[in-house]
Amino acid sequence: MKVGFIGVGWMGFGIAKNILKNNHELFVIANKNRKPIDRIVKEGAKEVKSYEELCKSGLDALFLCVTNSPIAHEIGKKIVSLLTDKTIVIDITTHNQNGSVEMEEILKVNNIPYLECPVMGGPVQAEEGVLGGIVGGSEENLKRSEELLKCFVKIIIILVVLEMVQKQNY
């Protein structure tokens, strides 16, 4: 699969590395910290310079692994018009109480499929591919994402209804 990744940082590096290990083509974009980007490019990822270049790469999936809801929403608003319904957004961001529901609303404007999957564990577990994941979204979107989730998640808790994932965080 062709996979994009926004947020290759502390947690994202290990997740991205495992996506590569499982023979998926990975496209990444840098933000503030060059070190994880340089490392993942050495592992075989392709670096792109803009959201437009990333979103126009014919992606099957786009991972979002950023610090919080406001950052995720800002990125969502920038990419929504660049993606098509052929790309599912898999959101690993740890959102605030309504963050993932708001993110899904942002993407719905252009019919972009969305799956929330906050993870349990840290950078070590991410690199080992043994994170826990709580998945929220439609069954169809879960099926589309399952192969990629298995690259880095050992235990998947499926809540299907997006709002249920948020309630589990509090």
Predicted regions mapped to residue ranges:
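NAD(P)+-binding Rossmann beta1-loop-alpha1 motif at the extreme N-terminus of oxidoreductases
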Residues: 1-57, 61-64, 123
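Short amphipathic alpha-helical segments
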Residues: 16-18, 41, 74-77, 101-104, ...
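Rossmann-fold NAD(P) dinucleotide-binding segment
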Residues: 51-114
